[in-house]
């Protein structure tokens, strides 16, 4: 049924259909009777799925990745829609329009998306208004990025401005230095550039702070960021963001080239995201939480990430292609696998493929 609907939606420009679908999600979860009904259908309330991470309780391990709810306008929708948590943003200190349209593209043959949105959002103050009014349903993280017009030398102050507004309202913060769509942003992943940014955010907020990294980092750079995260006392790492690579796609090269620059998400990112997860867990898995994101489409893949060391997992593109029952399907599948493996809770499964 959803595949038929998806084929119809794919006839509408991606950004427009995103707006329509997002509006519908907010509408059906706005009023208590509808919200209750939606949650009754989509939420998997199973004790084996509950876990603790950086002082928070997560009712289920699959969360909505950043990028879908950029301004936190749908912050009350994600729990009833079946997600165990959500990450809003990316939010910048100053409002900005992002890159010119078209800036979001589908690759159906690859079950992937390319985006060059460019952190389009209404600013941290605007998002703060919605976070201030939210109901307490599931944990909400605020993903913050650098304002495009701000020079790299002033990045720490820019991130601090967002953290000051959102830190008191979110359950955790994610510092995004890994989007390919803001010029120079990924350069901030270098340890000497990243250190003052992370320290500034840590000094500003009292909630857990994580950093989100790119799949295109070399293994050595992944290690360096992981070591820095431990040194500074971060709560965790979100791995990974979108990739700038285009190899191995089923979509013809000429079509891909015609779409231009941007970050690729979805199924093609899965292998590298899993590689980065395993590397991070081997290095720092006993010291912090790892949230794995990138190419997760099925319960088997989510379970694989958990066994490889992810305490929590996230999706965005999988939700687009999987539809409204996607989170429910993932969570029911994980619960089944937890019990089949003889575990009493999902926490026992984290990193089980390489026990410490």
Swiss-Prot record:
<dbReference type="Pfam" id="PF01180">
    <property type="entry name" value="DHO_dh"/>
</dbReference>
<feature type="binding site">
    <location>
        <position position="181"/>
    </location>
    <ligand>
        <name>substrate</name>
    </ligand>
</feature>
<dbReference type="GO" id="GO:0044205">
    <property type="term" value="P:'de novo' UMP biosynthetic process"/>
</dbReference>
<feature type="binding site">
    <location>
        <position position="295"/>
    </location>
    <ligand>
        <name>FMN</name>
    </ligand>
</feature>
<dbReference type="GO" id="GO:0006207">
    <property type="term" value="P:'de novo' pyrimidine nucleobase biosynthetic process"/>
</dbReference>
<feature type="active site" description="Nucleophile">
    <location>
        <position position="179"/>
    </location>
</feature>
<comment type="similarity">
    <text>Belongs to the dihydroorotate dehydrogenase family. Type 2 subfamily.</text>
</comment>
<feature type="binding site">
    <location>
        <begin position="66"/>
        <end position="70"/>
    </location>
    <ligand>
        <name>FMN</name>
    </ligand>
</feature>
<feature type="binding site">
    <location>
        <position position="266"/>
    </location>
    <ligand>
        <name>FMN</name>
    </ligand>
</feature>
<feature type="binding site">
    <location>
        <begin position="241"/>
        <end position="242"/>
    </location>
    <ligand>
        <name>substrate</name>
    </ligand>
</feature>
<dbReference type="InterPro" id="IPR013785">
    <property type="entry name" value="Aldolase_TIM"/>
</dbReference>
<feature type="binding site">
    <location>
        <position position="143"/>
    </location>
    <ligand>
        <name>FMN</name>
    </ligand>
</feature>
<feature type="binding site">
    <location>
        <begin position="316"/>
        <end position="317"/>
    </location>
    <ligand>
        <name>FMN</name>
    </ligand>
</feature>
<protein>
    <recommendedName>
        <fullName>Dihydroorotate dehydrogenase (quinone)</fullName>
        <ecNumber>1.3.5.2</ecNumber>
    </recommendedName>
</protein>
<feature type="binding site">
    <location>
        <position position="212"/>
    </location>
    <ligand>
        <name>FMN</name>
    </ligand>
</feature>
<dbReference type="GO" id="GO:0106430">
    <property type="term" value="F:dihydroorotate dehydrogenase (quinone) activity"/>
</dbReference>
<feature type="binding site">
    <location>
        <position position="70"/>
    </location>
    <ligand>
        <name>substrate</name>
    </ligand>
</feature>
<keyword id="KW-0288">FMN</keyword>
<comment type="pathway">
    <text>Pyrimidine metabolism; UMP biosynthesis via de novo pathway; orotate from (S)-dihydroorotate (quinone route): step 1/1.</text>
</comment>
<dbReference type="InterPro" id="IPR005719">
    <property type="entry name" value="Dihydroorotate_DH_2"/>
</dbReference>
<dbReference type="InterPro" id="IPR050074">
    <property type="entry name" value="DHO_dehydrogenase"/>
</dbReference>
<feature type="binding site">
    <location>
        <begin position="115"/>
        <end position="119"/>
    </location>
    <ligand>
        <name>substrate</name>
    </ligand>
</feature>
<keyword id="KW-0665">Pyrimidine biosynthesis</keyword>
<feature type="binding site">
    <location>
        <position position="240"/>
    </location>
    <ligand>
        <name>FMN</name>
    </ligand>
</feature>
<feature type="binding site">
    <location>
        <position position="176"/>
    </location>
    <ligand>
        <name>substrate</name>
    </ligand>
</feature>
<feature type="binding site">
    <location>
        <position position="90"/>
    </location>
    <ligand>
        <name>FMN</name>
    </ligand>
</feature>
<feature type="binding site">
    <location>
        <position position="176"/>
    </location>
    <ligand>
        <name>FMN</name>
    </ligand>
</feature>
<comment type="subunit">
    <text>Monomer.</text>
</comment>
<dbReference type="InterPro" id="IPR001295">
    <property type="entry name" value="Dihydroorotate_DH_CS"/>
</dbReference>
<dbReference type="InterPro" id="IPR005720">
    <property type="entry name" value="Dihydroorotate_DH_cat"/>
</dbReference>
<dbReference type="GO" id="GO:0005886">
    <property type="term" value="C:plasma membrane"/>
</dbReference>
<keyword id="KW-0560">Oxidoreductase</keyword>
<comment type="function">
    <text>Catalyzes the conversion of dihydroorotate to orotate with quinone as electron acceptor.</text>
</comment>
<dbReference type="GO" id="GO:0005737">
    <property type="term" value="C:cytoplasm"/>
</dbReference>
<keyword id="KW-0472">Membrane</keyword>
<keyword id="KW-0285">Flavoprotein</keyword>
<keyword id="KW-1003">Cell membrane</keyword>
